[in-house]
């Protein structure tokens, strides 16, 4: 996963662009003691037409990571130069909170895990709603918002799309009516569900999935335990293939 992002960085650096990509930071939500920000990288295109938007969610095992990590900047700038408005977001790190509170144990882990995913997915939805609310001012086409993420961030964007497709109450509450992402890009992600198979009430957005089969942190295929399932990129791709839903898996 990191190798792929590094390749993007090297490509962008080698291109030798003279223009500087403008970055602006906004607060999109305040939740108790957490002030959540997003960085907007302005698209470098000469015309005034509305632009697609690439949203990015960083990784770090839900215990660490930063939206403005220097290793991601060339990735953001690459897409900004291709005409995308790029948005990199904060989100609450549920596992970090549980560890800091001293409440994380083998017994409490399942509940903490579900809470962590709900936190991250809810924050993604709030950030997406913020982008939609500012779409006119930012020149964003709300029908062309792509969600991307790395590792824990990839889990978050996949969970976000999964919630939309299954009409999860949180998605319906936080997002504009009938909203869906134009696409999902997942670098080593997976979907968790409290049942032993994925379900798609609605057709998901086209997906671009990257995942290494030696990943020790996020399952490459499917892991089933005690009635729950954690479904990695291969399993997702196999199901999308069966349903003839557009996707690419590397």
Regions found by a protein language model. Give the residues of each.
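Bacterial Sec-dependent N-terminal signal peptides
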Residues: 1-22
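N-terminal cap/lid segment of alpha/beta-hydrolase-fold proteins
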Residues: 18-49
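The feature captures the conserved acid-bearing segment of alpha/beta-hydrolase catalytic domains
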Residues: 171-243
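Short beta-strand element of the alpha/beta-hydrolase
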Residues: 49-61
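Cap/lid segment of the alpha/beta-hydrolase catalytic domain
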Residues: 66-67, 91-118
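Primarily recognizes the serine-hydrolase "nucleophile elbow" in alpha/beta-hydrolase
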Residues: 126-203
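Short amphipathic alpha-helix adjacent to the substrate-entry channel of hydrolases
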Residues: 67-89, 94-98
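Alpha/beta-hydrolase active-site loop
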Residues: 106-136
């Amino acid at each position: 996963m990191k190798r792929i992002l590094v390749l993007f960085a090297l490509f962008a650096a080698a291109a030798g662009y003279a223009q500087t990509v403008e970055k602006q930071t906004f607060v999109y939500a305040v939740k108790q003691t957490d002030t959540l920000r997003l960085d907007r990288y302005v698209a470098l295109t000469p015309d005034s037409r509305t632009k697609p938007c690439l949203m990015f969610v960083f990784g770090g095992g839900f215990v660490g990571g930063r939206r403005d990590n220097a290793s991601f900047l060339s990735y953001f700038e690459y897409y900004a130069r291709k005409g995308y408005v790029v948005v990199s977001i904060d989100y609450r790190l549920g596992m970090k909170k549980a560890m800091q509170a001293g409440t994380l144990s083998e017994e409490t882990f399942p509940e903490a895990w579900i809470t962590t995913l709900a936190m991250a997915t809810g924050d993604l939805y709030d950030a997406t709603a913020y982008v939609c609310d500012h779409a006119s001012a930012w020149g964003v086409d709300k029908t062309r918002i792509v969600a991307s993420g790395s590792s824990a961030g990839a889990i978050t964007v996949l969970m976000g799309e999964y919630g939309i497709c299954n009409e999860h109450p949180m998605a319906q509450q936080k997002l504009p009516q009938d909203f869906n992402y134009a696409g999902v890009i997942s670098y080593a992600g997976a979907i968790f569900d409290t049942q032993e198979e994925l379900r798609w009430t609605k057709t998901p957005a086209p997906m671009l999935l990257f995942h290494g089969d030696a990943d020790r942190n996020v399952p490459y295929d499917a892991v089933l335990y005690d009635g729950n399932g954690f479904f990695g990129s291969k399993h997702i791709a196999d199901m999308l293939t069966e349903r003839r839903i557009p996707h690419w898996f590397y």
